[in-house]
């Protein structure tokens, strides 16, 4: 019996069971203390096991028998305590060969099942898919035993009927066909490329010739442009010389004109000085006395204007005062006449027709005087008579009296007052 401190390498695990533990103590790649009484220690391998999974003559989904050899790497999982405990329950006390056999049988069963669900072409062309399906299905099943599938791959694929060989021959024929087609296409492409190269060579040659011709043309054009520029420069130089000569002549003429202008300016200055002298002389002899006389006359006119204004203002004031006096007199007279008229109106209301008769009698002499007034202005009167009635002054007097006698009737027609009746009644 082993007791005390017990150790193990990283490729195995210690399983301590007995007293003091409700479940076994699992120590992967470490050490543990084991009591001599009531406890025991066991070991389980954690080595990776390589399995060669043979599946001979398995019928695929198409009914074609093929044989597959797969290589799987499996081991007891020591990092997961639950899986390690499961592995201890399943394999503790068993040898690696026994564990290998259990895992191999399980993998072979899953491999055969996957082969039966796929076609030969699928397994042959997509080995990765086949390996993945076997790996996934077997991993979940072996995990329940505490074993992990590290890897799985197909080592060999074969058949006894020559099916795979036929597929290979067909593929070989396709490859040969594709090779011949590729060779023909390559030759055609080579011919095409040769033609393109020749075309490019000719195009390059033509382009080169064109460039040479263009360069020659550019040279000729530039040479002609240079010749034109040289001729232009020569012409410009000649024109510049002529222009400079013309400018020189023009400048000489301008200077001559400037001299004439200066001389004329001096003459004008002399004339202006003479004019100023004469103006000063004129101002001393005529203008100043005239201005003095003008000032005197302006002052006299201003005095007369002031006098006239004052006289006009005095006259206006006199007229205003006289007008006010006359207005007062007229107002007083009008007031007296109004009072007299009021008294007459009162008398007229009292005496009525007698007052009217009295007023008319007072007016009749004035009417007779106005009737005879034109006669008083006559310087000479010539009387013509037919011989009947009055003649001479008597005739004229009778005419006047006849007019006067018509006045009472006229008054009666106008006012309705009978003067003759009123006088007799009075």
Curated annotation (Swiss-Prot):
Gene3D superfamilies for this protein: Band 7 domain (3.30.479.30)
Localisation: Cell membrane; Membrane, Caveola
Transmembrane segment boundaries: none
Keyword Cell membrane: yes
Signal peptide: none
Protein's UniProt keywords contain Acyltransferase: no
Gene Ontology cellular-component annotations: cytoplasm; cytoplasmic vesicle; flotillin complex; plasma membrane
Protein family per UniProt: Belongs to the band 7/mec-2 family. Flotillin subfamily.
Protein name from the UniProt record: Flotillin-1
Originating species: Drosophila melanogaster
């Amino acid at each position: 019996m082993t007791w005390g401190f017990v150790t193990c390498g990283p490729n195995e695990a210690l399983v301590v069971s007995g007293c003091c533990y409700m479940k076994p103590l699992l120590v992967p790649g470490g050490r543990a203390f084991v009591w001599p009484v009531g406890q025991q220690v066991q070991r389980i391998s954690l080595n990776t096991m390589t399995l060669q999974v043979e599946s001979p003559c398995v019928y695929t989904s198409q009914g074609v028998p093929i044989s597959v050899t797969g290589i799987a790497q499996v081991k007891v999982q020591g990092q997961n305590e639950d899986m390690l405990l499961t592995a201890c329950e399943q394999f503790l006390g068993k040898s690696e060969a026994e564990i290998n056999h259990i895992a191999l049988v399980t993998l072979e069963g899953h491999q055969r099942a996957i082969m039966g669900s796929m076609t030969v072409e699928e397994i042959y062309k997509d080995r990765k898919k086949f390996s993945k399906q076997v790996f996934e299905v077997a991993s979940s099943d072996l995990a329940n035993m505490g074993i992990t599938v590290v890897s799985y791959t197909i080592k060999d694929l074969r058949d006894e009927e020559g099916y795979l060989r036929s597929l290979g021959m067909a593929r070989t024929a396709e490859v040969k066909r594709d090779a011949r087609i590729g060779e023909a296409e390559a030759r055609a492409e080579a011919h095409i490329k040769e033609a393109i190269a020749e075309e490019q060579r000719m195009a390059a040659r033509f382009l080169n010739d064109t460039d040479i011709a263009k360069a020659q043309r550019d040279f000729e054009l530039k040479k002609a442009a240079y010749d034109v520029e040289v001729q232009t420069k020569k012409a410009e130089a000649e024109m510049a010389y002529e222009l400079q000569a013309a400018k020189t002549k023009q400048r000489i003429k301008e200077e001559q004109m400037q001299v004439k202008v200066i001389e004329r300016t001096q003459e004008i200055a002399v004339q202006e000085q003479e004019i100023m002298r004469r103006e000063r002389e004129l101002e001393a002899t005529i203008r100043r006395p005239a201005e003095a006389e003008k000032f005197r006359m302006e002052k006299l006119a201003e005095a007369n204007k002031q006098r006239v204004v004052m006289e006009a203002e005095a006259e206006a004031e006199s007229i205003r005062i006289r007008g006010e006096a006359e207005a007062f007199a007229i107002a007083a007279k009008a007031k007296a006449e109004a009072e007299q008229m009021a008294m007459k109106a009162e008398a007229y209301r009292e005496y009525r027709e007698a007052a009217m008769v009295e007023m008319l009698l007072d007016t009749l002499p004035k009417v007779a005087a106005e009737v005879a007034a034109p006669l008083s202005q006559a310087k000479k009167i010539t009387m013509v008579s037919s011989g009947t009635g009055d003649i001479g002054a008597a005739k004229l007097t009778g005419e006047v009296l006849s007019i006067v006698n018509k006045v009472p009737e006229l008054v009666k027609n106008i006012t309705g007052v009978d003067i003759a009746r009123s006088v007799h009644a009075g």
